[in-house]
């Protein structure tokens, strides 16, 4: 079986993203950060540029969101946050590089549902331990998938789609950006909750899956909102639902899957992490800076324009969330039969 492909589209923008947000690098304020009367290791973090490893390729949704975050962190801290793309094996190559970096706070990167919650069950062997080899700092964003269907499919709503699938087991196919990606697991969750057979057709990324949806080779896909919503708004495909727990602010007219199938939720998420052993004082300072960045109106607006929700958490909250996600998704992955040896 081939490795899962990176769960990421080359992303058309919903609204212009300013050069300042993407490249920013002006000195900012340190207000709002905890201070103590005695210097501690890392108490002046960051006092040099910070390398941020994005585990997915350039040009996709995660790349744009990561660069927006790093630009805002550069602005707030006065130090450059430099994005380095290290993609491959569904994000595993990049997170392994994070895990093996020096734990001083100056190499951080993107944690994600793919390597940190899906890979531990999907892969027979990993070069890292998702629960032990990282210092998690904060959540970063949550980005639901969008269920879209070919215009020729006789289903204009989720209930109509469910009825069609149940009446025709094995007749229809869904495409995904690869084995073990959130589009794959979204389709598997639909299959299991509806109780019928739907053929899974994995592709090497989201773009070829969308092309085959447009041509009718597959009838439905569920992938990140940025890669699908513009095509749906052009009328070339039909959007039926989002897979997050709430309706998306970028498309509030589209219902959630859970409105029809209670408990249905698959949301891509990002987090900021460094290697295990990063000093607690560095984690605390980074977390405080991250809160300023992720609550800044400019960043909130830019994230939401891309269909993502900014998501600040404490380090303890993101650690607990990651563990719960791995436990929640493991039965779904096993039931799908997906396994990478």
Residue map of PLM features:
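An extracytoplasmic/periplasmic, membrane-proximal ligand-sensing/linker region
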Residues: 45-49, 233, 280-341
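N-terminal secretory signal peptides
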Residues: 1-17, 21, 25-32
């Amino acid at each position: 079986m081939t490795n899962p492909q990176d769960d990421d589209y080359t992303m058309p923008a919903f609204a212009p993203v300013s050069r300042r947000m993407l490249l920013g690098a002006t000195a900012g304020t340190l207000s709002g950060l905890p201070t103590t009367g005695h210097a501690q290791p890392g108490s002046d973090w960051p006092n040099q540029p910070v390398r941020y490893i994005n585990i997915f390729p350039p040009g996709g949704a995660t790349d744009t969101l990561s660069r927006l975050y790093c630009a805002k962190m550069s602005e707030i801290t006065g130090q450059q946050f430099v994005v380095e793309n290290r993609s491959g094996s569904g994000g595993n190559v990049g997170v392994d590089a994070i895990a093996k970096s020096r734990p001083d706070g100056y190499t951080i990167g993107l944690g994600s549902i793919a390597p940190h919650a899906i890979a531990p069950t999907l892969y027979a062997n990993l070069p890292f331990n998702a629960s032990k080899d990282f210092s998690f700092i904060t959540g970063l964003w949550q980005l639901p998938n969008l269920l879209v269907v070919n215009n020729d499919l006789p289903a204009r709503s989720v209930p109509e789609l469910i009825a069609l699938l149940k009446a025709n087991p094995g007749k229809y196919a869904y495409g995904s950006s690869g084995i073990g990606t959130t589009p794959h697991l979204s389709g598997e969750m639909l299959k299991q909750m509806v109780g019928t057979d739907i053929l899974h057709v994995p592709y090497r990324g989201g773009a070829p899956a969308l092309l085959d949806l447009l041509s009718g080779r597959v009838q439905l896909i569920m992938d990140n909102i940025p890669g699908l919503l513009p095509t749906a708004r052009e009328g070339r495909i039909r959007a039926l639902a989002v897979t997050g727990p709430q309706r998306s602010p970028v498309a509030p007219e589209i219902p959630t899957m859970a409105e029809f199938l209670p408990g249905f939720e698959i949301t891509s998420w990002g987090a900021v992490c460094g290697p295990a052993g990063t000093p607690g004082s560095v984690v605390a300072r980074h977390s405080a800076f991250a809160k300023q960045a992720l609550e800044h109106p400019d960043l909130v607006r830019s994230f939401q324009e891309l269909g993502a929700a900014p998501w600040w958490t404490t380090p303890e909250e993101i650690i607990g969330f990651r563990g719960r996600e791995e436990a929640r998704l493991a039965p779904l992955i096993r039931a799908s039969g997906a396994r990478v040896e």
